[in-house]
Amino acid sequence: LSIGVFAFAVWLNRKTNSPLLNPLLVTVAIIMIGLTVFNIPLDSYEKGATLISSMLGPATAVLAFSIYQQRKILQSNFLPIFVGCLVGSTVSMVSAYGLCELFGLGDQVALSTLPKSTTAPIALAVTGELGGTASITMAAVMTTGVMGAIFSPMLANLFHIKNKVAQGVAIGTCSHAVGTAKALEMGKLEGAMSGVAIAVSGLLTCFIVIAATSIM
């Protein structure tokens, strides 16, 4: 069901070429409607999707290969890539926690949304370490990725960001794999740098969380 709906969503996105019809967003919407209309229990759906869920771990390991592939560009642009990922990851976590506190959503929601800009397996590991709620984390990760994929190209044009490395790093840091799919549409270098940024920002997020929790 998930694969079939996603394939349809990808076809629809390519057919319409609309950023609002993001494949992930369309897939989630269709599946939610389908589960509700046909009264399918969420537990049953989750059991059926176990195989897909089990691929999250190997998918994360592939990030190391993307770093290896782009090692020359990473070496020549190490400082701006590292600083960009560090600043982006820090701002993402601080803003998420700050907004949750501002609107009185509580520590549980705040801790669950901290890793929203990292890829799903890393985000789930971080939220598990913090004692957050996995379902909230996944919702935050998905929303962040979709919003990044939709608005990143617009923001790059708005602020006249022409450097392809900068575009890729910004997209990968703030909107992980969902944004990287959009970055690949923009160009090969943007997509590659976005993939590198996912891995680097994911590692930095883990280190920042470990450092913060040890201090607290």
Predicted regions and their residues:
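Small-residue-rich segments of transmembrane alpha-helices in multi-pass membrane proteins
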Residues: 25-37, 57-63, 83-95, 114-124, ...
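Transmembrane alpha-helix/helix-exit interface in multi-pass inner-membrane proteins
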Residues: 93-110
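Juxtamembrane boundary at the C-terminal end of a transmembrane helix
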Residues: 101, 207-216
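Alpha-helical membrane segments and immediately flanking helix-loop junctions
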Residues: 107-144, 158, 162-200
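Helical membrane-embedded segments and adjacent short helical loop/helix-boundary regions
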Residues: 1-68, 79-80, 84, 88
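Short helix-capping/hinge motifs at transmembrane helix termini and TM-loop junctions
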Residues: 17, 38-39, 104-105, 131, ...
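C-terminal ends of transmembrane helices
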Residues: 5-17, 63-76, 152-160, 179-186
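Entry/N-cap segments of selected transmembrane alpha helices
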Residues: 73-97, 138-147, 197-203
